[in-house]
Structures are given as C-alpha cells and as structure tokens.
Amino acid sequence: MSAKFGPAGNSEAFSIKYKTTLQAPGYLEAMGLDHYEYQCGRGVKVSDKIAFALKDKAKEHNITLSLHAPYFISLSSLEAEKRDNSINYILQSCDAASRMGADRIVIHSGSCAKISREDALELAKDTLTRARKTAVEQGFEHIVFCPETMGKVNQLGNCLLYT
C-alpha cells in the first residue's frame, strides 16, 4: 500500500478554470496528485449519472476516490434515533461510494455531548459496529470506514479506530 495525495472537494483555484467535479480527475492528474475525496458533508446527494461518470473519469486519469460522509453524523449521541440515523447516513455513503468506485468513506465521529469521553466512546463503538455489520450485510464489505476527528476539544477522537 502506498500513500495517496489529493484534495477533499474542489478548491477555489480549481473553480477559476473548471466547471464541474467531473473535470477534477484530469486536473489532479495534471498536478501530479493521485486521489480525490468526494464531499457529501451536507448529505449524500449524488446521482447515478454523476457517480458513474466520476468513476470513469477517475479511472481514465489514474485517480483513486474516497467519499466524505455527512458532517451531521453523531456516533455517540444520547438519542438512539440520532445514532440510528447516523447508521443510515453511513449506509447511504457506502452506496454512493460503491457506485463511484471509491473504496473508503470518511466519517466524523461527532462530539462527547453531555457525557464522559469513555461513555461517548462506548456509544460510538457500538454505533460504528452496527453500521459496519449492516454495511457488510448490504454488500458493502469492500468499503473501508475511516473515522476522522475534527480537532475540536469536545469532539470524540484520538483513539476511535475500527479494525
């Protein structure tokens, strides 16, 4: 395995010269980069047409893909409904990633809210385990879950790993 380098989403520099995300793989290849992270931070809203076209363009330009799941995922929410919704957002992300040929999704874990870090971690581990189990049952075993912290004091982080 080797390190991959590329942006998450499109930069202002990209937007000056290019119009659509489908042009990103060619742009990145020309810059000597080899990866692109498709952003779904505000919800998974990628059509089959765009997903399949991006998959083709990425392959044409030797660019690997990942997908950033929605920012409103909360693996450690005290509300079971929010944790269940988070699982659904993760599954939607797996589906979109699979359609575009991405092999991993990036997931923010959420905050510790009004509970201890230890309790938040236990809730997050349970939620992520249930999400992974369901993803595998739905045929997304090829999608790697990549938990990511946001670097804020109240965010759950530094030791949440899924193996």
Region annotations inferred by a language model:
Residues 1-94:
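N-terminal pre-domain/capping segments
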Residues 34, 162-163:
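Intrinsic, low-complexity polybasic segments
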Residues 59, 76-161:
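Active-site acidic/histidine proton-transfer and metal-coordination neighborhood
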